[in-house]
Each structure stands twice: as structure tokens, then as C-alpha cells.
Amino acid sequence: MPIAADTIKYGPWTMGVRYDLPPEDIGPNGLQDMLNTRLTQSAGIEKVLGTKSYENAAALAGTPTVTACGQFRVPSTGAERVFIVAGAAMYYYNSGWTDITGSVTITAGDDNTFEWVRAFDTLVLTNGVDAPIKWSGTGNAAVLDVDSRFTTADHVAFFDNRVWMANTNADEDRVWYSDAGDPETWGASSFYNLGSPVRGLQPLQNALAIHTEDFIAV
């Protein structure tokens, strides 16, 4: 015969994981421990997928910190290039990781993360610590020519057929832009002063959003 019982409900886990409380003090919306799982934004639980070597490639010597990772398509040839910056070197995958650092200086550091964009057939990267880098998808990487307008830049975007860079070593509130169609020609007056440190650049359809500490300019 049927047994009268209460429904047992699990989640949503809005209380989160409370490692600081004994299990008996945690309500039905809380967790005491988790393993290989994580909470979603809607307070659900999903499995952590973990990591796997790309194409089963051997690990880089010394296990350096990866500060850039992406897939770069060269439109003129259709070539697809998977690249990483790890430690003080840049690599792309070609039946194994091939070092393409060349003469470029890359300062290793856990916080020296790169932003990158594709500008026509050129990959452009910047980390705010070293000179901006370019790579064509073949050969070695090289320093991007910015006509000595600045030395480093924190942020980069590609919009209106121009490369945009912001928060440079000289002016944290300034946004520079290259000539249309030429990522390596930068006019002496090709910049905007925002009056507030720039914290990000994001193309939005027909506009470029410039995020500063105090406002967003479009």
C-alpha cells in the first residue's frame, strides 16, 4: 500500500557551499561539500569538465603559465592557427607546439594576460607590459609598428577597419587608432582623450564601446 511521505527537494543551492558549518546546521538549500562540480548562476549544479591536452600534445617544459590562447583564421588563405602564449614564449600548433617567439620580448608573469584581435590577415596581441605583437600565421611573431606613439597598451580592439589601443604607458585615459586598412600606421593626432582611465574596448555592431573607470563612451 502507498506510504504517505513528504517530497524531498534538492536545490536550488542558493545558500552555496558552507564549509564553515557542520552538516546538521546547513539548510536544504545549502551544501556541505562538493567534488568535481560547481554551482551555476541559477544555483544549480554542473560537472566540472576538467582539462585535456590539445591534440594530445606533450606539455611544455617547465609548465609555464598560459597568458593567451586562441584560434586565428587567416582570411586570405583560409588557414586556421591555434596559438598560445606561455611563459616568455609564443607557440602555434603544428603537429606539436612550434615556438614562434622570434625576437619578440614577452615578460612571463601570471598577471601578464593578453588581449588579442584579428586585423585583416594579422593577429595583434597586447598585454600592457610588453610592446604589442603581430603575427601573420606563418614564420615568427614580430613587434607591431605603432610609429612610436606609445610603448605598451592594456587594451586592443579591431573596429571600422582600424586597430584601436587604449591605456598606454604614457596616457591611461587615451585611446589610439591606426589608419583605416593599415594596422601599422598611426597618426600623431589619431587619438581620443577620455579623461578617465580606460578599462576595456568592445566593438558593438556599428559602434565601439570604451569602458572607463567612470563611464562608458560609445
Predicted regions and their residues:
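Beta-propeller fold detector
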Residues: 99-104, 142-147, 187-188
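A broadly used, surface-exposed interaction patch
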Residues: 96-119
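Hydrophobic or amphipathic alpha-helical targeting/insertion segments
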Residues: 111-146
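N-terminal beta-propeller domains
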Residues: 1-98, 151-218
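Short coil/turn segments at the loop-to-beta-strand junctions that recur within blades
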Residues: 104-110, 147-153, 195
